[in-house]
Amino acid sequence: MNREDYITFIDGGTSDGVGFFVGNLFITAGHVFNEGQIHSIYFNGQRIVLNKNEAIFFNSPNGDIPNPNKPDVAIFNCTGDNSPLVFAEDMPIIGQELTNISRRRVVVDDIHSGRSSIFTKKEVIQMHTCIGKVTHTTDYCECHTDKILRKGDSGSPLMNGNTVYGVLIAGEPETPRCVFQSSASIVTLIRKGNE
């Protein structure tokens, strides 16, 4: 399987997002989850329901400003799924070229019914990213992408090869400016959860 196969669309009814596997963990942005909605992913032909109450770690901060005391991340244990993706334990450096990979729903016309369907196909979106600013040392990094991201891209990974440097958690509307929760901060959360 390719690295893109371990990055999947999260179907949340009225709330969409993206997440990915690192080892046997599934990672996404916490704000992807809306109250009262069932969120699920499809991986290896199987539907997996994500219940935030069963997360190893879950936090969805209030407001649009990233807060180092409230990381915007959800981490789930998915035993049996073993991804080759790994977390970087260091921050990317300014000017480093990275890729953000997302999946989006694609509206296609159903020939038989004559109506559009949003469930037929998923599109892989790759954005070339350059680190422009590193803030909060180990918690966040700010990037500028070559395509403007949208709300449904939240939770997608910032990568170099199979190494994940962060998770998309915020962006400035109508601009290529994005903020990623750093992998280094997520590794710290996982270690604390295993203590």
Give the predicted meaning of each segment.
Residues 36, 153, 184:
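Solvent-exposed, flexible loop/coil residues
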Residues 165-195:
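C-terminal cap/linker of serine protease catalytic domains
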Residues 29-34, 105, 150-151, 165-175:
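Short beta->alpha transition motifs characteristic of CBS
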Residues 5-14, 20-23, 30-139, 159-161:
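Serine endopeptidase catalytic core focused on the charge-relay Asp
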Residues 20-21, 146-169:
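Catalytic nucleophile loop of clan PA
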Residues 24, 50, 58, 181, ...:
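Intrinsic disorder/low-complexity segments, especially N-terminal tails and targeting/processing regions
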